[in-house]
A protein has these predicted regions:
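A carboxyl-terminal module marker
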Residues: 522-683
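Short secondary-structure transition/capping segments
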Residues: 4, 411-415, 624-625
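Beta-strand-rich, non-transmembrane domain signature
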Residues: 41-300, 370, 383-389, 393, ...
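Sec/Tat-exported extracytoplasmic proteins
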Residues: 106, 184, 335, 352-356, ...
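Bacterial Sec-dependent N-terminal signal peptides
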Residues: 1-45
Length: 683
């Protein structure tokens, strides 16, 4: 709620859900329209009235009757001071005012918070004018306890200063209220405002005033519609200093007010949701340009500028242009026997993947020099993949780093480049007409494969091409094929199970088998089997070949004793529960890949038994045919043939399609529970 994700933070870019965000420019675009677009309102008055006995009347609120706390209002106002530091520095001032009703002790954490956490320096924000009160209702009267210095604790950790606030006399039903002012030096940063947090908010409002000489891009994100979206222009005149220009600027200011009413709490993660960062309602800002009395400067970063910046950084691209002679001798051995550029690339990739330990820390920047990574054989994701890029270049291959945002980090807005949108580095190598994308940071990833987390939209090559690289989940289809054969034999009723997994499931299982044995894996499967089923001769196919899809198999034997057998033809692949069981969903369905699951079973009818009941065949599909489920079964006197297939052809389902996909999976769950009923033939 409010500024950033805490109370005081510098402007920071948080990833934007591309389908639910848009960018507008202020004030340059808005200055083209001189009339006021709408009159500013002050609808927050009912919420910001004094605390009275009526404030304590509700024991719950209709917005969320189970909420442990409710934000009664959260209001921020940003203004500018053109005369900071005797006119030589421009600054923005944020004034924040918030009132919270604490309904349950589980929300008492809101009464203790860090007021500020920053490193001292000329670019650090300053905080003042803090005021706080605790209100309680006692004997029918409102009792106010004002905070004083004894409620504010100052801590120092190195050069990091922190101020911790603890509200006194907090009890269930209390109201806490506080306000403060933050001054941000400079004109480049307007603080991000979040309208949504862990608790419901009755009113959240952001009111900013900026001079039209500054041109900001504004990015909106979220699903709620503004109840206030106002614009007011005013005449202004003040001294400014830009470069060689010093004088009086005459122009206008623009005031923007955005407000949301009855904002629900940010819900917990739901199945098939990337990250809540994609869905929180918020506004953030980025300076594009300054236009002042003939002084013009562009601040918006282009991909050309961002690439140039990254390639010059010591902890990213600077060493990629070096010859790195310390690699010479070792690489002769590593690439020995490679007869083509692709073979050389495969040998390099395999060596880095198999000989370097990654701590799985994600980020754009190296934690150490490439030479130290080479010597220590360990590092973070950027260390290892930038080393891979450097080695490829050393060997004459056309290699470049690629930056992307992982699914857990959130969506990046590709047409508005900001480094904060990206948190992962991979390597791209161009061989003729083919581009190979490589990630050597994980031992279970094959050549030319990327982990599931990388498929999250556009990635960018950091080289002279500035190439967009599409890594959308819709582009990946995870295919799984399972075949089961059950036969009457001289040794009894036996069968074989074979399953070929797709790329991502193969990665998951290989990673799992780094922590447990093959026997442990199959023992966990055995525990899910019926008591009349035994397993032996189990194993994996291509376990130690990460490039290959991983298969597994086992042999089984049945000992039927009962007169009636309820036999489910789907062994391990059925949905035991609907992944979309919630009657109401708050965020779109975001699957990591498309699905093509095929399951085939051919079984002899066990000797001495007959088919008493067979499920009916069925075929259903979603309205747009993006999801299809087939369940086909038939039997004759001796054999049962069964085939089921689930196909999902798209990965993102908006909220208005949720009920349909929920019903679709409910049908699948119910259908896959239906057994084949076999009865013993009476003599």
């Amino acid at each position: 709620m409010g500024v950033g994700y805490g109370f005081f933070q510098y402007f920071q870019v948080v990833n934007i859900l591309s389908m639910k965000c848009y960018v507008v420019l202020i004030p340059v675009l808005l200055c083209c329209c001189c009339p006021i677009l709408s009159s500013a309102q002050d609808p927050s008055d009912p919420y910001m009235a004094d605390v009275t006995t009526q404030t304590f009347a509700p024991t719950a609120y209709s917005i969320d009757s189970s909420a442990a706390a409710v934000i009664l209002f959260d209001v921020g106002a940003v203004s500018f001071n053109p005369n900071a530091n005797n006119g030589h520095q421009f600054s923005y001032i944020l004034e924040k005012h918030i009132r919270i009703r604490l309904l349950n002790k589980s929300a008492f954490n809101l009464a203790t918070f860090t007021l500020s956490a920053y490193r001292k320096g000329p670019a650090s924000p300053t905080i003042d004018n803090f005021k706080g009160e605790t209100y309680n209702l006692e004997d029918g009267k409102v009792v106010t306890i004002r905070l004083d210095k004894s409620n504010i604790f100052k801590d120092q950790s190195g050069d990091l200063s922190m101020e911790r606030v603890v509200f006194p006399n907090v009890k269930e039903g209390s109201v806490i209220e506080y306000s403060f002012r933050v001054t941000y030096p400079g004109f480049q940063y307007i603080p991000t405002w979040t309208f949504q947090g862990s608790y419901p908010e009755l009113w959240s409002e952001y009111d900013i005033t900026v001079p039209t000489l500054y041109d900001y891009a504004v990015r909106h994100q979220g699903y709620q519609k503004y109840v206030v979206d106002s614009v007011i222009y005013s005449d202004a005149m003040f001294p400014i200093n830009f470069g060689n220009f010093s004088g009086t600027w005459t122009g206008r200011t623009i005031r923007r007010i955005w407000a949301l009413k009855d904002v629900p709490a940010l819900e917990k993660m739901e199945p098939y949701t990337t990250t809540l960062r994609n869905h929180i309602s918020k506004i953030d800002f980025q300076l594009k340009a300054v236009h002042a009395n003939g002084y013009d400067r562009t601040y918006r970063t282009t991909w050309n500028e961002l690439t140039d910046e990254l390639l010059k950084r010591d902890n990213f691209g600077a060493s990629l242009g070096d010859r790195n002679r310390w690699l010479d001798d070792d690489l002769k051995t590593i690439t020995m026997g490679a007869g083509s550029p692709r073979q050389r690339l495969q040998k390099i990739f395999t060596y880095v993947r198999d000989h370097f330990d990654c701590n799985n820390v994600e980020g754009l920047y190296m934690s150490q020099s490439l030479k130290k990574v080479w010597e220590d054989k360990k590092g973070n994701v950027a260390d290892i993949n930038l080393l891979l890029t450097a080695i490829c270049r050393h060997e004459g291959l056309d290699a470049s780093p690629v930056i992307l945002s992982t699914r857990q980090h959130g969506y990046a807005v590709d047409d508005y480049p900001l480094l904060g949108d990206y948190n992962y580095v991979i390597t791209r190598v161009q061989l003729g007409d083919s581009a190979w994308l490589l990630d050597a940071s994980k031992p279970y990833i094959g050549f030319g494969q990327l982990p599931e987390l990388c498929y999250n939209g556009w990635a960018r090559a950091i080289d002279s091409s500035f190439a967009q690289i599409p890594l959308f989940p819709d582009s990946m289809t995870e295919t799984r094929l399972t075949t089961v054969e059950l036969n009457n034999t001289d040794s009894g009723y036996t069968g074989t199970y074979n399953r070929d997994n797709g790329i991502f499931e193969s990665m998951t299982i290989r990673n799992r088998l780094r922590k447990e044995t093959v026997d442990d894996f199959f023992e966990s499967l055995r525990k899910t089997m019926a008591d009349y089923k035994q397993m032996d001769q189990y194993g994996f196919d291509s376990l130690n070949v990460p490039e290959a899809d991983l298969g597994w198999h086992y042999r089984m034997k049945y000992n039927f004793r009962n007169g009636t057998i309820y036999f489910n033809p789907i062994f391990h692949e059925r949905f035991n529960a609907n992944p979309f069981n919630a009657p109401v969903r708050h965020y779109p369905v975001e699957m990591p890949f498309c699905i093509n699951n095929i399951y085939v079973l051919n079984m002899d009818i066990p000797r001495g038994y007959r088919v008493d009941q067979l499920p009916q065949s069925q075929r259903v599909k979603l309205e747009d045919s993006s999801g299809i489920f087939e369940y086909l079964i038939s039997a004759d006197d001796s054999v049962i043939h069964f085939r089921t297939q689930l196909t999902i052809r798209k990965t993102n389902y908006p909220l208005d399609e949720y009920q349909e996909i929920r019903d679709f999976f409910s049908l699948i769950v119910a259908k896959e529970k239906e057994p084949i009923v076999l009865k013993k033939i009476k003599p």
